[in-house]
């Protein structure tokens, strides 16, 4: 049964078409793994729903023509617990929503399930998607499948989609839904040695995705290969009338653009990303991959993104301001956690003090301060102006180049028991935040292992709506570097 868990989504689809195994057998193998997992990746398990989808898939394969069957039919997947799932607990990994059961389905999870995917359950994450290590969850931290070689220590899976990345890397599911506000798909994918893609802002509907920072939030996917990411992304993209920023641009068949050809493509290397604190091993792999792309016909050129140095403070001001607004709805009145008190004001205060975790409260306070009447112009308005400059830097760069190649994270994953201060945690997102502020598509792809035996990754950033292009460049990198999948235990 373990052999079935090693398969890619494409291999699963081919095996199901050829009747090499049934969807029930495939899903049962994954259910068994999820029931016995020790990573704390799944916080809600839905074996009955997965088996129902598997039986429906087997029925489809028995009577439908091949070209009418979705490539995700019967494929076991996990869904980050930020996406509302009708009738299934959705908590955002917060005490505030510990027992919340939505009455509606998020658009992206609905599209995924309508494609025939079998949902194994809901995945652990940093509370309200705020964090870079998946150590801020009300349900406890997630463990990475990779272990540090020198001392045998466990390491973090990254965040906030740590459960999504760890579950895919650990062969608990073939693919997972995640969300990316400032790097929450790409950074954990990098730490876990898997592929993570954030599409252009507006490509995927935000309807039913619990809001963190609305001008930045975007759904994404995590898989074990670039081609698998293309297949999953195809399923969840598309226009949605229920999301005001949803794009009406047609969604191409991303998988058909993966041809391994980068001849004539101009790849930009921004000088501003060569900064202090970046691992020498990551720099070495960055240079090695750039050389490989050049050998395969791409033109590698230097570019400048002068306002990159402001990205982290700008991001944390904007996302914290939007957090303080979005999370104001959790007051103990309508739904969610509630502390009974003598007065309404006391009930509000106690509910929010006990219902939110430390990191969430920290960001609410920062955001409330930035939006206050005495500081709005000084902080929030100025941050939005610099965000526009960051976006313009990318627009100018893409007038001369096709793609940008940068690291996904400055270092390998750090120890699970290490407690870096919040500033260090912020810096983990230094390479992912700029693309988020600009709303650009970006993909993280593994490129090797460090001397400690931990995954290293690079990121390909593309122009607006060029998900197909970054998937193709990432596939070329994947061909050169190989997949760094950890052996199945």
UniProtKB/Swiss-Prot annotation:
Catalyzed reactions per annotation: L-glutamyl-tRNA(Gln) + L-glutamine + ATP + H2O = L-glutaminyl-tRNA(Gln) + L-glutamate + ADP + phosphate + H(+)
SUPFAM superfamilies per record: Amidase signature (AS) enzymes
EC number: 6.3.5.7
GO molecular function: ATP binding; glutaminyl-tRNA synthase (glutamine-hydrolyzing) activity
A GO term from the CC aspect: glutamyl-tRNA(Gln) amidotransferase complex
GO biological processes: translation
Active site: 80, 160, 184
Family affiliation: Belongs to the amidase family. GatA subfamily.
Subunit text: Heterotrimer of A, B and C subunits.
Record-linked NCBIfam families: gatA (TIGR00132)
Protein name, as recorded: Glutamyl-tRNA(Gln) amidotransferase subunit A
Native species: Wolbachia pipientis wMel
Organism lineage string: Bacteria, Pseudomonadati, Pseudomonadota, Alphaproteobacteria, Rickettsiales
The gene coding this protein: gatA
């Amino acid at each position: 049964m373990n052999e079935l868990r090693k398969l890619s989504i494409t291999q699963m689809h081919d095996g199901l078409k050829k009747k090499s195994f049934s969807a029930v057998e495939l899903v049962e193998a994954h259910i068994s793994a999820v029931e016995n997992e020790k990573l704390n990746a799944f916080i809600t398990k839905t074996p009955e729903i997965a088996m129902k989808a598997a039986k429906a898939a087997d029925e489809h394969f028995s009577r439908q023509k091949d070209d009418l069957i979705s490539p995700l039919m019967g494929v076991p997947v996990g869904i980050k617990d930020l996406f509302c799932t009708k009738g299934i607990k959705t908590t955002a990994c917060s005490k505030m929503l510990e027992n919340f059961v939505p009455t509606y389905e998020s658009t992206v999870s609905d599209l995924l399930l309508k494609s025939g995917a079998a949902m194994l359950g809901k995945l652990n994450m940093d509370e309200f998607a705020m964090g870079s290590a998946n150590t801020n969850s009300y349900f406890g931290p997630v463990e990475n499948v990779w272990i540090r070689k020198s001392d045998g220590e466990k390491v973090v899976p990254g965040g906030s989609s740590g459960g999504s990345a760890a579950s895919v890397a650990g062969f608990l599911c073939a693919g997972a839904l995640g969300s990316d506000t400032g790097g929450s798909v790409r950074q954990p994918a990098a730490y876990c040695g898997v592929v993570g893609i954030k599409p252009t802002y507006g490509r995927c509907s935000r309807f039913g995705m619990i809001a963190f920072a609305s001008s930045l939030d975007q759904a994404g996917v995590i898989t074990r290969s670039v081609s698998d990411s293309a297949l999953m992304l195809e399923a969840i993209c598309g226009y949605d009338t229920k999301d005001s920023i949803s794009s009406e641009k047609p969604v191409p068949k991303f998988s058909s653009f993966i041809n391994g050809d980068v001849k004539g493509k101009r790849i930009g290397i921004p000088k501003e990303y060569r900064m202090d604190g970046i691992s020498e091993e990551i720099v070495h792999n960055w240079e090695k991959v750039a050389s490989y792309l050049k050998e395969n016909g791409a033109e590698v050129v230097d570019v400048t993104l002068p306002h990159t140095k402001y990205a982290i403070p700008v991001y944390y001001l904007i996302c914290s301001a939007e957090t303080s607004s979005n999370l104001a709805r959790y007051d103990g009145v309508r739904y969610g956690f509630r502390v009974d008190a003598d007065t309404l004001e006391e009930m509000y205060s106690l509910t929010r003090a006990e219902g939110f975790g430390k990191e969430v409260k920290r960001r609410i306070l920062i955001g409330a301060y930035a939006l206050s009447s005495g500081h709005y112009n000084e902080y929030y308005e100025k941050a939005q102006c610099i965000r526009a400059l960051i976006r313009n830097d990318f627009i100018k760069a893409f007038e001369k180049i096709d793609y940008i190649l940068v690291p996904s994270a400055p270092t390998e994953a750090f120890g699970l028991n290490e407690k870096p201060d919040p500033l260090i945690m912020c810096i983990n997102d230094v390479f992912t935040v700029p693309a988020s502020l600009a709303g650009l598509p970006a993909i993280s792809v593994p490129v090797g292992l460090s001397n400690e035996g931990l995954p290293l990754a690079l990121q390909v950033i593309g122009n607006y709506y060029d998900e197909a292009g970054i998937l193709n460049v990432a596939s070329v990198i994947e061909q050169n570097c190989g997949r760094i999948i950890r052996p199945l235990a």
